[in-house]
Structure formats: structure tokens, C-alpha cells
Amino acid sequence: MAVYDTIILDIEGTVCSISFVKNVLFPYFLDKLPFLLEQVEFPLDHTDNVTVTQILAKFPERYTKSKECLKTYINELVANDIKDPTLKQLQGIVWQAGYEEGEIVVDLYNDVIEALDRWKKEDKSVYIYSSGSIKAQKLLFSHVKFKSETRDLTNYIKGYYDPTSVGSKIESESYLNILKDLNKDPESAIFLSDNIKEVAASIRAGIKSLVVKRPGNTVHHDNQSFDFVYSFDNV
């Protein structure tokens, strides 16, 4: 395998299980949502300088006229896994409280922490590109379960990207935007994700890209025109 000095990683299904997001983060958010909405007056005052109100006001106005209407709309977004940037902002606030209270910790795949340590020793730069907000990405990597303790792994990560900063993960232009921001050539970078559409977009940008196969991920047939890896051990 060629030598790369820039490693770009997806999160869900790549460094941690899809079930962590679906079975831990999403339910936690939905459980806290009613309490969050109880703290806000409806209809929303769009001139309010309270952070939560400002975020809620970004949802379509037809859904923000009442608490129940907005709650139903947000629940539908989550149920359908809609990558809505306003939803991501709101989730980030709720998850931050959960992480800080010790109610949320993330289990990374066993090979991930070892790889991050190895890449740092090899002077390689690691970046995260996820559909989750940059705030949520940083929270996740700063609250990692490791044996009997919680570790902060943000010192291993040089930078973070999300769709609001560089564009959609299934568009090749987004990966070119990352390279431009890093002042890197495509040949110096490698991208890893469990999502074939994301890998295809990255390849179109000229970046070496690998499909990560983890337990519980979507089944892909190895005869497709992609390179697969089952862990980060040989990356």
C-alpha cells in the first residue's frame, strides 16, 4: 500500500458501530427533547438571543408555531435519519450535556485507538469528516470508553469537517474542498468510510479510498470495484 501522510476518517460504521448512533445517541436525544422544548416559549421569538431558541427558529416556520408540532417534526427527522443541519446543531447541545454528565460514552472499535496512536508516531495527520456536526464529532472523541476509564482522544485529531463546512459527503467537490483547506494533493491522502457512495465520491476527487467493513454494516459484495478493509491494522 502506498504511503499517505493525511488520513480522513468517517465516524459511524467506521470508527464506532452504527448501533452507537442508532441505539444510544438518537434515543438519548429523543428522550431529552420534551424537556428541552418545555424551556422554550411558543410561538418562537425569532429575535430571542437564547442559543436553543435561535437554533429552533432555523426549522421551517410552519413547524415552529407550537411545541407539539415541532416535536413531531423533529421526531420524523430523526426516525428517517435526515441529515438536517439544524437538527445536528440541536442534537449537539443535548449530547454535550449527556457527555459532560457521564451519561454518554462511546466504544470505538479495538483497532481504532491503536491505529490513532500508530499514525501519530508515524507523523501522519488524521482528520474527521462526518455527517454529524463538528461539535458532535469533538464530543465523541473526547469521551471514549477505554477499559475502565474515559479517554480524550482529540489530541490525535488534527481537524474536523462536516457538510456545513465543506459540502455533502457524496459529492466529489466536498473532498476537493478538504484538500484545498489542507493544502494537500489528492495523492497524499486516504479516506476510509463504510459508505460506498462516500467512497465513490472521494475516488472521483482523486483520493485513495477504502470501504470499511464492520460487524452490522451494510453488506457489500467484494466483487465491486472498491478496495475493502476489515480493520485499520494495515492502513
Curated annotation (Swiss-Prot):
InterPro entries linked: Enolase-ppase_E1, ENOPH1_eukaryotes, HAD-like_sf, HAD_sf
Residues engaged in binding substrate: S130, S131, K169
Organism: Komagataella phaffii (strain GS115 / ATCC 20864)
Cofactor: Mg(2+)
Record-listed Mg(2+) binding positions: D10, E12, D194
Name of this chain's protein: Enolase-phosphatase E1
Record function comment: Bifunctional enzyme that catalyzes the enolization of 2,3-diketo-5-methylthiopentyl-1-phosphate (DK-MTP-1-P) into the intermediate 2-hydroxy-3-keto-5-methylthiopentenyl-1-phosphate (HK-MTPenyl-1-P), which is then dephosphorylated to form the acireductone 1,2-dihydroxy-3-keto-5-methylthiopentene (DHK-MTPene).
Subunit structure: Monomer.
